Amino acid sequence: MMKNWEDTNGCIFGDLMQIGTTGASPQTASQDNHTISGVDASHKMAEFDLERMNQYKGIIMKVARAKRMDPAVIAGIISRETRAGSCGSGLVNGWGDHGNAFGLMQVDKRYHCPEGAWNSEEHITQATDILITFIKAIQQKFPDWSKNDQFKGGIAAYNTGPGNVCSHEGMDMNTTGKDYANDVVARAQWFKHNGY
């Protein structure tokens, strides 16, 4: 059952803290030379990104309120996609993924026309709108899934597209590292406990 508006930071898409997650795969965790994987690795990576993430906290909170999205999920995606703008994330003038994806949340230019500066409110708003579109697509594709599973499926779709989210059990099967939604959810849960 969904908690009230205030308990979920105004998020209407589900309750982040009630979503099950296995966290980062060993492949994803190896970015930081972690010998651990799973939720613990996701939490460590989120913790490592917190100082940089806090530079964008005001924007994240503003966009989250306007879009009725959990700010911790936005932070989780930013952490996964660009390590909150880290130099080591491979960003060059805001571009990553071999010049195909733009900004903190890596909007793919092959499917969307990137808006704003790479670290701007306009960019985070656009990327959050894309996420919401994918959550709604998963809600339509899988109407029998719980609201929280649809939320998690939308996060997977943000990475791989809704057509590549094929089942509840294989939600991450076609995502980068085969762990995108699980890793983002685990990072987001950490950010939720740390001010987001």
PLM regions and their residue ranges:
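Non-catalytic cell-wall polysaccharide-engagement segments
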Residues: 1-38, 46-54, 65-67, 98-99, ...
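N-terminal post-signal-peptidase region of extra-cytosolic proteins
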Residues: 57-58
